[in-house]
Amino acid sequence: MKTALVIGGGFAGCAAAHQLQLLGGWDVTVVERAPFLGAGVRTRYYGGHPYTFGPRHFLTPWEHIYHYLNTYVPLRRCQDHQFLTYVEPDERFYSYPIHADDIREMPEAKQISEELSAINTSAVQRLTPEQLAKLTRSELRNLNNASLAKNFEDFWIYSIGKTLYGKFVDQYSRKMWMLDDNKLIDDFTWSPKGVTVKEGPRAAWDTAISAYPIAHNGYDDFFSIATQDANVQVSTEIERYDIPKRTVWIKGEKKTYDIIINTVSPDLLFEKCHGELPYIGRDLHAIVLPVEFALPKDVYFVYYAGAEKFTRVTEYKKFTLHKAPTTLVTLEIPSKQSKYYPLPIESEKAKAKKYFDMMPEGVFSVGRAGSYLYNVDIDDTIRHAMEVRDQLKS
C-alpha cells in the first residue's frame, strides 16, 4: 500500500484525504497543528449558538462539486441571500452588488450616472464596427474599460467610476488588506469584463449555487467521514521538512512518503528560504443580542465600507436556522495576528511560485494557503483534491 502525508487538516486537507480514501490503496496520515479538524470551517458555539470563523456558506458554479458535498453533508440552498453595505456619509445601507435602484437614491446620483455613461461611451468607441455588431444590447450597455486596468483601483474606477468606487470599495479594500494604497493590489484573477451595476432581483448569487449544511453542526460530519480511514494526528507539529525527498520529522521520528499533499503556506516547507509569504488575518468577536433576529429578512451579513475598524457583521442564524430567542452576530476586524488570506499581489504570487518550483514530483500544494491564492473557497479545495486524485489515477 502506498503512503501519503496530508499536511493540514482544514477543509482542503480533509477533502484531499477523502479523495485518497475513495481512490483506495493509500495509507494516509493527516497532520494538523490545531486540536481539531476543519480549521475555520469547524462549528463552534457561543451562548448555545452554532457559528464558524466568519461566514462559510458553500458557493460554487459547479454542479458536480455541489452534489459531491451534498452527498456527505446535506445542504440547504440559500439563493435568497442578500448583502448590504453601510455607507456612513450617506447614513444609508445599500445593496451589494451595487444596484441601479439604489443609485437613483444616492446624493450624487447625477454625477454617478454621468461617470457610468462616460465609461460606457469610451468603451464603445474602442471597438470596431465588426466587434460591436456581435454584442447584444445588454452587453453593449455594460461595456467598460476594466480590461485596461493595471491595478485594483483602476479596475474599479474603469468599471463603475470614481464616485461609486469611493463609496463602496476604496476604504473597505484598504481596511481589509491593511494597505495604504489599493494600487498595490495587482492580482487580476477577477473578470476582465469588470464589475457591472446590478438590475432586477437583489439576491447576490444569481449565477452560482449558494448553500449551507442542514445539520446543526454544519460541515463537521464531513471532516469525520473524509478522514475515517486515515491516521489523524491533531495537536501535532511537523518539526522538520525535507520536501525534495518527501520526508518529514514528526515527534522526533523521520518519515518518508510516496506522496505529500500540502495545504499550509508553502514557505513553511522550505524554511522561508525565498522570504516569508504575507497574509492578512482576522480577529472575530462574537456577540449575542437580546432579539430573535438583528438583520432584515434575507440579509445574512453586512459590509462596512468606511472608517469603522470592522469590515463585516454576520448573523449566523440566517445560515444555520438555529432556533433561539436571541441571535449571535460576529464582527470581523482585519489583523496580522493570524494568517487567513494570501495577499493578491503579483510579486508575492511570484515568490510563492519559487516555492512551488522546488516541489518534486509527488508533492502537491492545494487549498487557499497551499496554492497561495485568495480567491479559493470550499468548492475550489474540493476541486483541487479531485484534480490530485485524477493525476494519481493517470
Task: Write out the residue ranges for each language-model feature.
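N-terminal Rossmann-like FAD-binding beta1-loop-alpha1 element of flavoenzymes
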Residues: 2-30, 389
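Conserved Rossmann-like nucleotide-cofactor binding loop
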Residues: 12, 36, 267
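Glycine-rich FAD pyrophosphate-binding loop
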Residues: 21-45
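Mid-domain catalytic core of redox enzymes
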Residues: 23, 239-244, 250-358
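Dinucleotide-binding Rossmann-like beta1-alpha1 core, especially the glycine-rich loop
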Residues: 47-134, 138-143
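Structural/interface elements that position substrates and couple domains in central-metabolism enzymes
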Residues: 67-71, 155, 164, 297-298, ...
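Active-site/ligand-binding neighborhood in enzyme catalytic cores
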Residues: 92, 108, 113, 117, ...
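C-terminal catalytic lobe of FAD-dependent flavoproteins
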Residues: 342-394
